[in-house]
């Protein structure tokens, strides 16, 4: 075994895989430490990728040069476009994944990747010097691996405990090993830890459930994919359906009669669980007025014999879980392969991180994923990619990649984590992004592909394909502006017959697209440049034309905000010397130590008056470093 690496990544989940691949692809000698060789990028909870905001993150990962989108496309059982009846700012792609094939795909990518070693041992601690600079890790056999940077992506394995009713025992997900020594190292380094919780529902045997009364939830009959490079699509007739059922009054009564047996309500658990993915008993307590709740029955893999009971996670003891399951319609004879459980684990306070995802007070140590207080595979993968990129760039002496809130949902997430902190597992939502009309599902490439190319993760071939992609959009918009249709044209007749539009005079194709009721597919046969475009390209054209005024106004606002990002705050500033700064603002600014005025303005507890005082102080004390208003 080698003993010296550039980058060591601890944990082979979704964050760890992206971090390790990014580092290795940037020519860094990289080690990925994982407890099991066959458990890479597993899906211990929901067997799906994407969804509102999260699906856009997957496309952002792809645009930057990550792997998740390709894996999700290659192993999709069903593909669905969500929120299509609403505004384009909240459209989102979601795939039901074959979890076994997804993990196998990522294992193969890891094994084939140059510069990357997979080491199946436990990390028992961090090696660091007296200056709080991490220099490597300890393995379970007391071997030391040296590194220039270490990235911790331990997910829910960090000092984790499984909870079922009053039963509580040390374990990782699915009764796998847990990781304990790293927590002690973090505490010894002065890093503040928190305790969070999540949970997962039961897996039930397919042949024990009758879904004849369930509502079928099919995929979307469109050529949809996460990755820019995906060119093959699973036809709708070959996609696997999901099913929708509802809990019953009996289910509710079982919960109410046994609430004190739940780990959540018996006092066994004091840690905080995810607000947007609550246990079923949580739903019953929090929404007392509701007698029933939605439950989705989802396939996990074509190679298996189980259903995933989405929306039915619980920390009830097994005997109560059985009653709960058998109260569901079609589940009267259900047999269970894996029971539901809650899991409690250590994570850090992310306000201790810099925007690069390196710890502020510990050099060469990066963290990504659920250890940073987030939930979800996509959030983890996005952080892992950024951590892997920035660890590599630090070794090369380059500035970190820091995505702004107007550039990416990944930027929104990291900015929220480091400036606002978390008090419950953080989940990305479209409502967290103030510029969501700019952060759309269709335009991840045009937002971020340039970054991916400059970083070094986009190949020459993919870059050439992207340039063609952009040129095709530009050519189509040009042609739409030039071509005109009279009221007697075949297009006008078609639109009138389908009650999409009544062209009373001559219109350009561009003007026709502006009509909200018009489907761009009606124009395809009349405009040659539209015929070769992908779904995402067509969506981009419609949105850019139809929402032209809104997009322009949003970009003007962003231009003003970017100026605040350029106003740097010196690292040696003493906030106690800033006159008329509120006490809370001083405390928060000192703790977070923002890099610029834009970041400072987004910190909870720092108000506009505080920012004005800070600007005044900077102009006075650092006249050569501050930027003019």
Curated annotation (Swiss-Prot):
One of its GO terms (cellular component) is cytosol. Keywords: Cytoplasm, FAD, Flavoprotein, NAD, tRNA processing. One of its GO terms (biological process) is tRNA wobble uridine modification. FAD binds at residues 11-16. It is found in: Cytoplasm. Its cofactor is FAD. NAD(+) binds at residues 273-287. GO terms for molecular function: flavin adenine dinucleotide binding. It holds the Pfam family GIDA_C_1st. SUPFAM superfamilies: FAD/NAD(P)-binding domain. NAD-binding protein involved in the addition of a carboxymethylaminomethyl (cmnm) group at the wobble position (U34) of certain tRNAs, forming tRNA-cmnm(5)s(2)U34. Homodimer. Heterotetramer of two MnmE and two MnmG subunits. Belongs to the MnmG family. This is tRNA uridine 5-carboxymethylaminomethyl modification enzyme MnmG.
């Amino acid at each position: 075994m080698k003993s010296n690496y550039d980058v060591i990544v601890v944990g082979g989940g979704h964050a760890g895989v992206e971090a390790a691949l990014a580092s290795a692809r940037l020519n860094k000698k990289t080690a990925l430490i994982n407890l099991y060789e066959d458990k890479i990028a597993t899906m211990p909870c929901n067997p799906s990728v994407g969804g509102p905001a999260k699906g856009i993150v997957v496309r952002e990962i792809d645009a930057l040069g990550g792997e998740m989108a390709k894996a999700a496309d290659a192993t999709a059982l069903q593909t669905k476009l969500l929120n299509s009846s609403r505004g384009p700012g909240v459209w989102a792609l979601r795939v039901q994944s074959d979890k076994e094939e997804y993990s196998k795909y990522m294992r193969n990518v890891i094994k084939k990747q140059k510069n990357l070693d997979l080491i199946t041992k436990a990390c028992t601690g961090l090696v660091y010097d007296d200056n709080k600079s991490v220099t490597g890790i300890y393995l379970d056999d007391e071997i030391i691996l040296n590194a220039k940077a270490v990235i911790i992506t331990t997910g829910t394995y960090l000092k984790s405990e499984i909870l079922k009713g009053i039963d509580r025992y040390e374990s990782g997900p699915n009764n796998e090993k847990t990781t304990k020594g790293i927590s002690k190292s973090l505490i010894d380094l002065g890093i503040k830890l928190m305790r969070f919780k999540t949970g997962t529902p039961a897996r039930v045997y397919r042949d024990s459930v009758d879904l004849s009364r369930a509502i079928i939830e099919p995929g979307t009959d469109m050529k949809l994919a996460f990755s820019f490079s995906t060119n093959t699509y699973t036809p709708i007739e070959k996609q696997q359906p999901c099913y929708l059922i509802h809990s019953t009054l009996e289910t509710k009564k079982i919960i109410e009669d046994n609430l004190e047996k739940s780990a959540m309500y018996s006092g066994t658990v004091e840690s905080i669980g995810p607000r947007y993915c609550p246990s079923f008993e949580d739903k019953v307590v929090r929404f007392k007025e509701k007698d029933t709740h939605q439950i989705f029955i989802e396939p996990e893999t074509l190679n298996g014999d189980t259903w995933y009971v989405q929306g039915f996670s619980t920390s009830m003891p097994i005997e109560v879980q059985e009653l709960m399951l058998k109260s569901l319609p079609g589940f009267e004879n259900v047999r269970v392969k894996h029971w539901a459980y809650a899991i409690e684990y250590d994570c850090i306070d992310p306000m201790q991180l810099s925007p690069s995802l390196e710890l502020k007070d510990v050099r060469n140590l990066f963290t990504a994923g659920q250890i940073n207080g987030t939930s979800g595979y996509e959030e983890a993968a996005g952080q892992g990619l950024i951590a892997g990129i920035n660890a590599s760039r630090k070794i090369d002496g380059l500035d970190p990649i820091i995505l702004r809130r107007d550039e990416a949902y990944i930027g929104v997430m990291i900015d929220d984590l480091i400036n606002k902190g978390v008090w419950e597992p953080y989940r990305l939502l479209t409502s967290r992004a103030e510029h969501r009309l700019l952060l759309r599902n269709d335009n991840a490439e045009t937002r971020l592909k340039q970054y991916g190319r400059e970083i070094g993760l986009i190949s020459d071939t993919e870059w050439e394909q992207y340039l063609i992609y952009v040129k095709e959009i530009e050519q189509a918009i040009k042609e739409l502006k030039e071509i005109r249709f009279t009221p007697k044209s075949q297009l006008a007749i078609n639109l009138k017959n389908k009650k999409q539009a009544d062209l009373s005079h001559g219109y350009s194709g561009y003007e026709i697209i502006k009509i909200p009721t018009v489907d761009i597919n009606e124009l395809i046969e009349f405009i040659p440049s539209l015929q070769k475009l992908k779904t995402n390209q067509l969506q981009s054209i419609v949105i850019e034309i139809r929402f032209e005024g809104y997009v322009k106004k949003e970009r003007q606002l962003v231009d003003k905000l970017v100026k605040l990002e350029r106003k740097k705050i010196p690292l040696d500033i003493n906030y106690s010397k800033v006159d008329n700064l509120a006490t809370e603002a001083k405390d928060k600014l000192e703790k977070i130590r923002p890099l610029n005025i834009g970041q400072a303005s987004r910190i909870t507890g720092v108000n506009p008056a505080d920012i004005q005082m800070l600007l005044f102080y900077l102009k006075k004390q650092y006249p050569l470093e501050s930027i003019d208003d």
